[in-house]
Amino acid sequence: MANVNGSFVSPSADATISPQLFYNVDSLSAVLNGFTFWKALATLFFAAVIYDQLRYFYLKGSLVGPTFKLPFMGPFLQSVNPKFHEYKAKWDSGELSCVSVFHKFVVIASTRDMSRKIFNSPAYVKPCVVDIAHKLLGPDNWVFLDGKEHVEFRKGLNGLFTRSALSSYLPVMEECYNKYYKYFLEKSKANDYKPEPWMPEFRELMCAVSCRTFVGHYMTDAAIKKIADDYYMITAALELVNFPFILPFTKAWYGKKASDMVLEEFSNCAAKSKAHMAAGGEITCIMDAWVKAQQDSAKYNEKIAKGLPVEDSEKPSHLLREFTDYEIAQTVFTLLFASQDATSAACTWLFQLVADRPDVLEKIREENLRVRNGNINAPLTMDLLDEMKYTRAVVRETLRYRPPVIMVPYLVKKDFPITDSITVSKGSMIIPSVWPATHDPEAYPNPDSFDPDRWITGDAEKQAKNFLVFGTGPHYCLGQTYAQLNLIAMIGKASLEMDWEHAPTPKSEDIKVFATIFPEV
């Protein structure tokens, strides 16, 4: 037992003790009286600043990035109006770099291999969208599925992009080219063929092609025009840095109104498609193909349920449940969401790049005339598109030289040991980059030169690991073949119907970042 060397005897009375005790209480009271609301607020603010910095230091670890974070907001202002050269500086700073905006910690991968690792790590990451996306696309939209559910849903869409399916969409695609090229010529003539901006027209053309391909003629020309005009607001609402709430007259508010309009139009189209296909109509668009697959699955399941004999040939390649009009609209909306900005950017660059290189435009024109045997009105077919080797090379080089989507945000689902020494924390955003891979001099010599021949006489086709334009892994772009065929057909048809020139400005080669990349002016 421990010995206690002490006494329980009360200390002797000491007249000096009591006044000292009262003096301390008075001091505490004075401090509390001086501790105003504003002082308390300032104390909390400085404590929050310190916490924010310490959290940033912890998450940053050995990653390349700013030594300190601007309290709370980080580089928010730069994120609101992103500049391409700022992204380029990040890529050049290291294989992995970081930044923190408000509560979001962001890791940016700059090399091909690091980007591919992220794309191919579904156990650790999933595609990341801004908070408002759930309100615009619908909280139960398939794009928010993950893992097995996502894989199974995609299987039901794969049949919409087979060679035979794509062939059935060509007539409505060519119809759009013919209509809009006639309009382009009339518009240019009305302006006395003077230089003018054409990006809005290219956006509308691509929107029209997408809508006609997705929903055929179930939608009016006026509705397509409305979607083309308003889709810009959806893009603005889905920028990475934006308000997570829908407040009146904000980008999110305007974007929600536009998305509701698109979903209503697509829902009406779905009802019409169901009636058309149930009556034995032919497939003319993606919606028709998907509705028919659903109806075929329903017929097969009904026979099985009744115990009727069914030939193996009658079983659909992938059994689908029946989707409501709204569910079909949501899915088709995601196809528009995935394609509109990217194809608009590619279309704009394509027209500008070939205009700046008349020899390239002339080769495209010669090839398209030759494969049509001199008949510029020969209808598009898959076989015809297959013969356009040079036109395809121009499209592939455009996508490499100016990849529409330069980065793809992912959310870290659980701590991600991306290297032996770096683990990205759960909840962080991690971004594989496309641009550095498509401008890697080891894969593409003189990467900053536009050279379509690298896809014919060079070995660019062998650099598949670097061509990350459509992603890779479980979330690769479903419509990558369709997107490229669309661009090949579009520029080929344009070369036969029109001639065009580009009046360069000092900023023509500068890059504007708005969801995708466009020429600055």
Curated annotation (Swiss-Prot):
Q: Which GO terms describe its cellular component?
A: endoplasmic reticulum membrane
This protein's UniProt keywords: Endoplasmic reticulum, Heme, Iron, Lipid biosynthesis, Lipid metabolism, Membrane, Metal-binding, Monooxygenase, Oxidoreductase, Steroid biosynthesis, Steroid metabolism, Sterol biosynthesis, Sterol metabolism, Transmembrane, Transmembrane helix
Pathway assignment: Steroid metabolism; ergosterol biosynthesis
Does the record bear Lipid metabolism in its keywords? Answer: yes
**Pfam families in the record:** p450
The protein's location, in the record's own words, is:
Endoplasmic reticulum membrane
The entry lists its GO molecular-function terms as:
C-22 sterol desaturase (NADPH) activity; heme binding; iron ion binding; monooxygenase activity; oxidoreductase activity
User: What is the name of this protein?
Assistant: C-22 sterol desaturase erg5
- Native species: Aspergillus fumigatus (strain ATCC MYA-4609 / CBS 101355 / FGSC A1100 / Af293)
